[in-house]
Amino acid sequence: DYAVTGVQTCALPISQEVFVREQARSVAALREALTRPETIVSRTFWSAMYGAHPYGRQSTPESLASLQRDELQAFYQTHYSARRATVSIVGDLARAEAEALAQRLTEALPSAEGSPAGQIPAPAPVDVREQRIAHPAAQAHLLIGLPTIKRGDPDFFPLLVGNYTLGGGGFVSRLMKEVRDRKGYAYSVHSYFMPLAQPGPFQIGLQTKKAQADEALALTRSVLQGFVAQGPS
């Protein structure tokens, strides 16, 4: 019942008063986020990988402030169609009960066919580069990566298993053992794949003292290069 109420609430027309309030809240939240190093480095990382590609586009306080209520409502009516909805249900339900629940969950959504999503182009090859951004934070936030695989790639599970050894396995990963345990450069270091409709990023991330950022970066690259050359044991 809570889920049904939530969908029905989302389907209601948005008043101008509510739109203006939520727009102002979103602009303020983004302005605050843009002061934080983790937000800055993440946005810079995606822009460096994808440039003018749709994956590289970033919202700004100005772009959010320019959005009109009618534009938001039209987008919702076009793309949030019941015919395009996917409903996942887990529990002790018969098929007929699940179908009835799915019908209740989607009946408040627009009934139009919906506009097909545009084809996202493949990103252009990315050049190797290093960007440094001055910030008064006590720690340096480091990200390393590049576009790699898209959804449905046959190598996803081999890469997932391999990355568990490299940096996705927490305290048993090579990056954690070298960067944290052996050298003490960071409390945590991670790596993961993010497949998208087009090649999404492989990313390594960590935070460290500014004074040792160069050493931490060099060690992280060394571990990555060794893993690529030799693979897991």
Q: Positions of the model-derived regions?
A:
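Single conserved hydrophobic/aromatic residue that forms the stacking wall/gate
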Residues: D1-C10
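A common structural junction motif
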Residues: T9-I14, L105-E113, S222-P232
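Non-catalytic beta-strand/loop surface segments
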Residues: V20, A29-R83, A108-D153, G167-D214
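Helix N-cap motif at beta-to-alpha junctions
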Residues: G91-A96, K209-A213
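Hydrophobic side chains in well-ordered alpha-helices
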Residues: A98-L101, L175, A216
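Extended amphipathic alpha-helical segments enriched in small hydrophobics
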Residues: P201-F202, L206-S233
